[in-house]
Amino acid sequence: MLIKLLTKVFGSRNDRTLRRMQKVVDVINRMEPDIEKLTDTELRAKTDEFRERLAKGEVLENLIPEAFAVVREASKRVFGMRHFDVQLLGGMVLNERCIAEMRTGEGKTLTATLPAYLNALSGRGVHVVTVNDYLAQRDAENNRPLFEFLGLSIGINLPNMTAPAKRAAYAADITYGTNNEFGFDYLRDNMAFSPEERVQRQLHYALVDEVDSILIDEARTPLIISGPAEDSSEMYIRVNKLIPKLIRQEKEDSDSFQGEGHFSVDEKSRQVHLTERGLILIEQMLVEAGIMDEGESLYSPANIMLMHHVTAALRAHVLFTRDVDYIVKDGEVIIVDEHTGRTMQGRRWSDGLHQAVEAKEGVEIQNENQTLASITFQNYFRLYEKLAGMTGTADTEAFEFSSIYKLDTIVVPTNRPMIRKDLADLVYMTEQEKIGAIIEDIRERTANGQPVLVGTISIEKSEVVSAELTKAGIEHKVLNAKFHAMEAEIVSQAGQPGAVTIATNMAGRGTDIVLGGSWQSEIAALEDPTEEQIAAIKAAWQIRHDAVLASGGLHIIGTERHESRRIDNQLRGRAGRQGDAGSSRFYLSMEDALMRIFASDRVSGMMRKLGMKPGEAIEHPWVTKAIANAQRKVESRNFDIRKQLLEYDDVANDQRRAIYSQRNELLDVSDVSETINSIREDVFKTTIDSYIPTQSLEEMWDIEGLEQRLKNDFDLDMPIAKWLEDEPQLHEETLRERILQQAIETYQRKEEVVGIEMMRNFEKGVMLQTLDSLWKEHLAAMDYLRQGIHLRGYAQKDPKQEYKRESFAMFAAMLESLKYEVISVLSKVQVRMPEEVEALEVQRREEAERLARQQQLSHQTDNSALMSEEEVKVANSLERKVGRNDPCPCGSGKKYKQCHGRLQ
């Protein structure tokens, strides 16, 4: 009550921010007459003037009034479009590291030109980030004339571009591209083998369009660059045949492990678990199929990978549905983006899930992939010095933007008042009743010439509605799963009188639906239109536009509520643009996923009390409130998941930044010999310590083991036993110095043969390749640790703290392994002529290029807990037999027999 009173007196923070910015807008408007008097040349010269002022130390914020006035005037001359005052406000919000919420149709694309121009003046680059390649190209080409008029260069960053083309795009003042491509380029740059291969500059300012989609909806799925791993397709096929014999547990007991069925499903967390009966049955079937030996357990260390196959196959059959989560096309399983309904060609699920789905569908199984590099959007976009974003719906997620990205959300007022009618939800008992009501509503509205946009949450649902409309003889267009440039064209014409368009989630987002259709596209279709033709097209459009307005404007039908209120608001926001008439309504049934999982008991209880009959709908504020509460539950759960993901990824992010920083330093220097010498000293000290403990008695020395290690790992023949025999007084310290000196001299002889420059290049190449190889293995180990760490909670330990502690220990061990591997490779390489080193370097580069060609980019992963960290250690030790005198794999530096080997 007190907060409401204070807000009434002083205004909300949003109001105060807009009042402050309105004063600057007034200044810009006062400048307009003077700016209008400038010639084109004088207006263009303003860009150079601003740059000079910045170079002399003037603060960027001081340029806002004049710079915005210049962009507005340039837009008037180039496009014939003048920025509204609310667009100037939006531009200022975007310059202040904030999220600007601007309603659909308020001109976000034109608004973005203001902060993009202002921040490009420093010459450090601006990245305008969009959700797909089509929008990136469209916005870049549409705005190119304006920016080039003002003397700025434009670049477009698209997939499959060559490195020189990408470098040119990033060198431009303003670069348009997708969030995926910017992120993948960052990862690829940090896998480059020479400075010339890198394409990005330092990350300066990112302006993210549809920011809620990119920073929230896609935040849970990291960007991953992966390479091929071992082939295990046969096992997926064999395990897949067993899964259909398992029966789902009907009732979810508090102890799902003791249930009646073979597996239980948790729909809220999208997890599936074997019950005790299921475990017994699957073990029995595995034995009968000859996959597992009699008397073995699926949970025994030797069967960890088999458990991985069973879990993946079970999830593929139970949790992933054809035409909802994926489609099968030309013998290939293609993921469907849950947020947009579009197919994601070339993207694959990780952890063997994609292979399990391929086995289920009977298509060719492709090899599993191993992660080479990964980053979440949360951590990628936080690398920018300055970040801002815009969307039509951000206010419901303001807390998340603030807590994770430190971005405030400012709601920018509309240019004209919103008059759209948002009708109350109608709830039916069954899906069939709901679909029937939707068809009748469409029939009535189209009969009056009113255009209708039907929003669905999946391809499957859009096809169901489409089939019913076809049966009813209602002409319509369907947008789902396949993104192409025509999508925007279809969406732009969805405002034609009586048009019916079905679209999944956000298909066509970024394109306005103009009442009466788009006259611009009609003119564009003509080769060389005359003035008369253009006038006739505009006149015909005006008649259609007026007819649609008279019928009530665009009507939005939601076939069910989404998990997030924000996505519902996005669908509603397609109607009522720029003060146009419009309406919206959601149709729900008790069989909808959201209602079934989160709101079923309470709402179905209400419906029973009201004595509803088949075909009747309930329309009541209580129901709407219950649904809103269900959505809040889901939003809260999803926020917790994203927050938890970030907390864990922050640990990996610190390590990633350290590795990438070290790697970039390595790329930028030509001579790493000092580093090599320092590493060699550390490695030999650690190695000798394993066999000759410091200040120990000679009886404790393992000279035979040391000689063997030096021979095997460093190709050094050192008669240490003979030295000690010939020189009884040989001191331990002197012995250490002699071993190191001999190693250095042996290496110097190699250097004399091949030449200093060649050896420096080879050293650098070996360091880079070894670093990449160990980092790749470390990422896999971190994944396994992350998947099993939640089990530490059962031991009354904080999983996050345990993860931080163990991942740091793993990182330290990796750095020690890096030193050892580098010195081992450099010591063992046999060279006689410079050509041999050159051949080795060429071979190394060819191998790196081959791996680069085999890389797969993915932004769709699945974070299921498949293996515990303890199980991974055992599995790894079973894969590779460790000799008793070998260094212990734990990275302690001790011999295996003196460390973890003592347990056997």
From Swiss-Prot:
Cofactor note as given: May bind 1 zinc ion per subunit.
Compartments, as annotated in UniProt: Cell inner membrane; Cytoplasm
Gene3D superfamilies referenced in this protein's UniProt entry, alphabetically: Helical scaffold and wing domains of SecA, P-loop containing nucleotide triphosphate hydrolases, SecA, preprotein cross-linking domain
Annotated membrane topology: Peripheral membrane protein
One of the record's GO cellular component terms: cytoplasm
Binding site for Zn(2+): C888, C890, C899, H900
Predominant cellular place of this UniProt entry's protein: membrane
Catalysis performed (reactions): ATP + H2O + cellular proteinSide 1 = ADP + phosphate + cellular proteinSide 2
Signal peptide coordinates: none
Enzyme Commission number(s) from the entry: 7.4.2.8
Positions contributing to ATP binding: Q87, G105, E106, G107, K108, T109, D512
Pfam families: P-loop_SecA, SEC-C, SecA_DEAD, SecA_PP_bind, SecA_SW
Induction and repression of expression: Repressed under conditions of excess protein secretion capacity and derepressed when protein secretion becomes limiting. This is regulated by SecM.
Transmembrane as UniProt keyword: no
GO molecular function: ATP binding; metal ion binding; protein-exporting ATPase activity
Keywords tagged on the record: ATP-binding, Cell inner membrane, Cell membrane, Cytoplasm, Membrane, Metal-binding, Nucleotide-binding, Protein transport, Translocase, Translocation, Transport, Zinc
Subunit: Monomer and homodimer. Part of the essential Sec protein translocation apparatus which comprises SecA, SecYEG and auxiliary proteins SecDF-YajC and YidC.
Family, similarity comment: Belongs to the SecA family.
HAMAP family for this protein: SecA (MF_01382)
Identification of the protein by name: Protein translocase subunit SecA
Organism listed in the record: Yersinia pestis
Higher taxonomy: Bacteria, Pseudomonadati, Pseudomonadota, Gammaproteobacteria, Enterobacterales
